[in-house]
Amino acid sequence: AVERNPESSEVGILFAAHMRGRAGARAIDTALTTMRCSNGPSARAMRSFGPTAATDVTGFGLAGHLLEMLRGAGVAAELDLARIPLYPSVLALAEAGIVSSLLPENGRLATSVAELSGPDASVHAILFDPQTAGGLLIGVPEAQAAACLDAIRAAGADDAAIIGRVLGVY
């Protein structure tokens, strides 16, 4: 199972929109508040659940860091895109074509993505959006995922979610 900390997957899109006067104050305030939150409590909460991999999501975006974790373990994963926590209005901004200037570079990592279904261009932009002070991406044994998620939420990451699962060796 793959878990992620609260609403931190698309800071690049939000601030690209902000520079164009297209990001709402609520979205920017939410992003700034979230970026000030430490990942420390979530990191401590996950320790007793046998994490197999963990990283903070930063410049390579959620997908870039996930690919790095998967390659290191020689496995693949399936994401449930509807479960990925997003800042307010980010999907609409991505659908309007507002993306970070780093997206093309990060998007080159997409050659490792076997299948991407859904509203492809906007989903691609969100998954590869570079982050500043992103949340944690954590791999734990599937049998421990729900309990780990509960512990992370109890530690203060209310929007943490199980966003996918590891499929096995590729």
Predicted regions, residues:
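Helix-biased detector of long, well-ordered alpha-helical tracts
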Residues: 1-170
